[in-house]
Amino acid sequence: MAEKVIRTIGVLTSGGDAPGMNAAIRAVVRTALGKGLKVRGIRRGYSGLLNEEIIDLSARDVSDTIQRGGTILLTARCEEMRTPEGQQKAAAICKKYGIDGLVVIGGDGSFKGAQKLSDFGVNTIGLPGPIDLDIACTEYTIGFDTAVNTAMEAIDKVRDTSTSHERCSVIEVMGRDAGYLALWCGIANGAEKILLPEEHDYDEAKIIADIKESRKRGKKHYIIINAEGIGDSMNMAKRIEKETGMETRATILGHMQRGGSPTAKDRVYASIMGSLAVDLLLEGKTNRVVGYKHGEYIDFDINEALAMQKGIPEYQYDIAKQLAI
């Protein structure tokens, strides 16, 4: 069978937005144009694809975007893309607009859509875009570095006022199934306790006992970093205050972690990944996801990537506990 010729590349962002997505879009557009290809941007992810919200992109269309947070193509979640009918319709629309290859920037759900499009003959490459680093095949996802720094700066401010008032603070960060944001923020902010969905070691009685003991050791504050997957931060704070007598406040950082200008790392890594995605399509590859491991950019079969399991580095978690004295 003759190798598919790539003449036009599409690019979309799907699911939650992440700082650095614009850098990736920019790299896809300019790399493809530099290699003589046409580029079509798809607005609002798979929802926009199904509604034919498709525009031509030039080098100027992505000017002044590398430093901007969010995604210039907009993003959305799309239930219709989960159905066989929606997937077949999406593939037909790609063919209608001459899109031979598609770069999908997003997470697991976005990659499942890319996998189905590949089955229907649209060459697809995925770029990892969840800010909580929950893609198992890679040590880096677009936006994670910015999200960590955004959360760290916010937690520093909460810590300042917690010390002044000799207060306990329960600070909730994103991470439904993955605790990387909580772990990194916990280490970076010197938290006394980090609660991770992967560890299954949440024991409120032990936390309360530790808070009481820390007061005896002269600690003026007690910082708990709580991953979204554990949740219940508001009620947790109320129970802690009731049992310890220590004024306790809950802070949920929420969607602020998705915003803001991307860090240098996110701009550089996203740019490299976007450029590599175009190269992979020109090599005739499909149903692949770009990752970063052991200092190298690599690509995996999407099916294999989705099947991988990711755990928290225990040595990092142990270090966090050792330092919280």
Locate predicted features.
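Short beta-strand elements at the ligand-binding edges of bilobed clamshell
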Residues: 137-148, 261-267
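N-terminal phosphate-binding or glycine-rich loops at protein starts, especially the Walker A/P-loop
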Residues: 2-50
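Short, ordered loop/turn segments at secondary-structure junctions
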Residues: 14-17, 37, 42-47, 77-78, ...
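C-terminal non-catalytic interaction/assembly regions of soluble proteins
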Residues: 232, 240-325
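Short glycine/serine/threonine-rich phosphate/pyrophosphate-binding segments
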Residues: 18-28, 50, 84-85, 101-115, ...
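Accessory alpha-helical/coil subdomains and C-terminal extensions
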Residues: 104-106, 116, 123, 144-247, ...
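Glycine-rich oxoanion-binding loops at beta->alpha junctions
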Residues: 2-3, 49-102, 109-110, 142-149, ...
